[in-house]
């Protein structure tokens, strides 16, 4: 009957007895007169339960599942709203028999079979009627473990089912198998069978029966357990029962067998045994070595597997010389593989551990002989000589083992001594063996891929290690770690070396000599390429490795090293690494493996550990070029600038990579596959992405740029692109034979609309004027029409138009002029032989607009790139409007060019005396100086006075507020030639002083010679003052901006008497010390005096543009 029915050992959930109420849910249901029938715990438990209650057979659960899927597809409008994602994909997943289902399927089954579902969820809690369709018939289920459904029947169902089951089995055996079962049933004790059955299959909430789990644990080796008859015979209950125990249960009218659940439980146990055998490595093959124990409490003996059968297999016991079919097998320990029978061998202990004899500790006779160690690899993967290892003589194996163990004892006793050559060989052999064991079971492709990943990780850790996290190791600690690492190789030595004595030893000697020569030539900066690892074979001596490689080389090194630097610890000699050594790459180049760029804004330190981001203190650049020696970095989470006295520390928090050449955005502009500069691609307007660039390098650059810009919204893109571009130019200059490329266009804003239709920038549209781009030869480039999206980056609100006192109308008049004569021919002299790389434009432009954004502080040291002010920064004024006549000049080489010294060489008051009484003022022009502080001084003062001048213009004089550009160019030609290289002009502050008082204006106007003298002398004096201020600021350790942060409470002198023209309005209630707000500009108080008695000409607190003008010079 066992073969016919196919029912394995198991039990029931029925019968009388206290064991079946072991779970609270069963006890609760029994009180209600209900019985829970267990269902197979897989993805089809719901369909199994419905199939039995509706179709009276669990075997039809697949049919119920497919019918449910069909019903869901036919009534898609009813259920699609409750499905996340694609409805068709959901139905496709439901076709998998292991896919779990839920409320949607229950609702569909209720409508399909016209039955309401009642589910018991928790003990002592009323059931839930999940479907309320008012069907007369009900389906009772028990929900447990969050995803499993069992069947709930009235308790009478179990009693009647047990009686029917016994009658069915009795008819089957008597009529079909011709077996008289009446006498057999009478001989059995019904209650005993019932109790045993209940104890075997008493299911709990967490898993199946406990006794079955225990039986499976005892049967994990794949041996067949005793049958029911044998168990009964051993217990003495019966001596001649021809039927199995489960058949006897089926014949018992008081016991109900849950046949479906027993079949699933048996298959589950078989699968668990297979999984356990695979996981534990207990799948033996013919020829494998193992250990057997013939008796229950006997010793484990070494054996070889001679044959594999379905469950049990014969093994050859070496120590007994006989074949046995054993049930208790285990894998041999590593130290027992070189143990063979001999007269001097000490017998192993009962625990299976082998001990060395007394001879093992006497020391080796010849320590220079090569040592062949046993293998840690599985038996079938090692060299064929490992199978014949037991054929060695006892003297040979014993001498080898004692040499090996004694040498390792000597190593542990003297850890500070230099390790001898044989020991070093064993260290490398062990490293090779451990590496091979890590790749066990992988294909060659997977092995190479894993090795490449490990090499990349090790290289990244060597380059970016942290001195403080891993301090430098002393010589004794290095040697001690090396000796400790070499100890385990006593047990896990590779057996790839053959066992032949004569020829093998000669070959080992030659290999050792070759290896010693290799180690003699190995240097600190040698690094094996990833391709080298692919060529590593069984030759253990071809790999330069480290004893502590498994710990990822924790020896420290400087933060900036050569990209190809690699620390070789093949010879564990004393290794001292100074934490103060700073290596600078002679030729900047990308490392062999560039570490992955983490997602912003996480900042990674040298060891790859994410560090907290300082609030408003993250800077995206580290050095201005490859010539800077950068030491170990320290993150400063405080937004207040710290002291810069420490020369060996970077002034800013570290970016994601320690070098500009490792930045994903390097070199700051897109390059094609050939490495040439690529043209900025057009915008992608297709949703499918068909118009995206085909070049992956261009796509990668703009993707990284977009991620960076999105992750750092308070940083203008050129703030981190400019240092990369400068680093690229510095790298190009390091090669004198390579011509430095000249890019006439702006490095980043190439596609900006250079000169659009004048109607786009007039005052009617309230648009700020666009900037044009100037080439290096002084000629204007052809205007390029950009996308209409960026034609108006910022619109001035109407409130600002009324407050600007004719500023926009004056701007419109300036825009109507022809910009073709902006640049004079004299510019060619200043540009020749100097920096041919135009710096990024700053100010109102199509991408950034007139309101720049950046954190409201300035770094300790200015790196030369434009640093913009924040909109809420009190030192930031965003109301400077540049006319279209001068907008092309800002893109010239700002490092060597002073535009204001040409564009404003002669003031409008000197040129047009007749307009002096009409309060004609010249528009302030953005000034750029060859010195950073001088440029800031002139620009700040010019901006402040420009606000004063514009505020005092009467509306009637708006139409006469500018001279023609041709006249300006003609006046420039009157400047003496000897002053051309100097290019210093009269400060705009002095121009404004002349205009301030109309009564004394005639006295202020001086001849051309005096004007030239003042132009030559005055900027030099201001420059000397600024140099002293900068030196004092640097010695104090704080930037000037730090002392000027008022956070929106101060009002500027340029704003006295009228409201601001942009941004946020400042509070004037706290500024009573400044005097009456209605004080006239002509009543004096032109400058406040500083502590030295000099006016605040160079003080950035008076600046109208704040930090913005710092971007005009390098």
From Swiss-Prot:
Ranges of residues in domain OTU: 34-155
Enzyme Commission (EC) number: 3.4.19.12
Low complexity compositional bias, start-end: 392-404, 474-487
Gene Ontology molecular function terms on file: cysteine-type deubiquitinase activity; K63-linked deubiquitinase activity; molecular adaptor activity; RNA binding
Documented effect of changing residue 204 to A: Loss of 'Lys-63'-specific deubiquitinase activity
Pfam families, per the entry: OTU
Modified residues (Phosphoserine): 126, 128, 166, 199, 202, 204, 341, 443, 546, 893, 900, 1006, 1011, 1014, 1023-1024, 1049
Modified residues (N-acetylmethionine): 1
Composition bias, Gly residues: 8-17
Disulfide bonds: none
Expression induction or repression: By HIV-1 insertion.
Sequence segments annotated as region (Variable-loop): 94-104
InterPro entries: OTU_dom, Papain-like_cys_pep_sf, Peptidase_C85-like
UniProt xrefs under SUPFAM superfamilies: Cysteine proteinases (SSF54001)
Main location: cytoplasm
Complex formation: Interacts with MYD88; the interaction is direct. Interacts with ALKBH3; the interaction is direct. Interacts with USP7; the interaction is direct. Interacts with USP9X; the interaction is direct.
Protein name: OTU domain-containing protein 4
Organism: Homo sapiens (Human)
Taxonomic classification: Eukaryota, Metazoa, Chordata, Craniata, Vertebrata
